[in-house]
């Protein structure tokens, strides 16, 4: 397979997205809400979990693929991909805890993990663009 890290990450996150989508549908059926959140806080929360995953995943997968195509170190990419996924899983866990009136700590850790992973990937790509493409 040409892009094994990107492919594995995409597959795992696709399954996670299906799970989150199921949670949204289940809540829609429960509250008989076809569109929006219908003034239901739990619906807001499950929709937020789903949409947040979709907001961060595409650009991360693109960056992983670009780095894999540039023959970047697969082990380092795998570590970053796992960190990103942990961040996304922690975000959902944190959203559920926050909705239950508990601390936002897990959401904060999730966002720092997600953003840090994305910044590292972006800087790595910029570094390769400058050093490999512009200076050679």
Task: Identify the meaning behind each predicted range.
Residues 90, 94-119:
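Interfacial loop-to-transmembrane junctions
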Residues 13-16, 20, 83, 87-94, ...:
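Membrane-embedded alpha-helical transmembrane segments of multi-pass integral membrane proteins
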Residues 22-47:
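Cytosolic, membrane-interface loops and tails of multi-pass inner-membrane proteins
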Residues 52-64, 118-119:
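Core segments of transmembrane alpha-helices
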Residues 1-31:
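N-terminal signal-anchor transmembrane alpha helix
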Residues 9, 47-50, 80-83, 106, ...:
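Physicochemical signature of membrane-embedded alpha-helices that form the seven-helix bundle of GPCRs
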């Amino acid at each position: 397979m040409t892009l094994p890290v990107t492919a594995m990450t995409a597959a795992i996150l696709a399954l996670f997205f299906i799970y989150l989508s199921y949670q949204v549908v289940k809540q829609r059926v429960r509250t008989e809400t076809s569109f929006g959140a219908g003034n239901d806080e739990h619906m807001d929360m499950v929709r937020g979990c789903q949409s947040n995953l979709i907001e961060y995943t595409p650009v991360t997968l693109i960056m992983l693929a670009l780095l894999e195509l540039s023959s970047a170190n697969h082990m380092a990419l795998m570590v970053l991909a796992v960190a990103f996924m942990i961040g996304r899983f922690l975000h959902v866990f944190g959203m559920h805890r926050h909705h239950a009136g508990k601390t936002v700590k897990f959401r904060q850790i999730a966002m720092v993990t997600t953003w840090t992973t994305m910044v590292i990937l972006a800087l790595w790509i910029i570094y390769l663009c400058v050093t490999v493409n512009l200076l050679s």
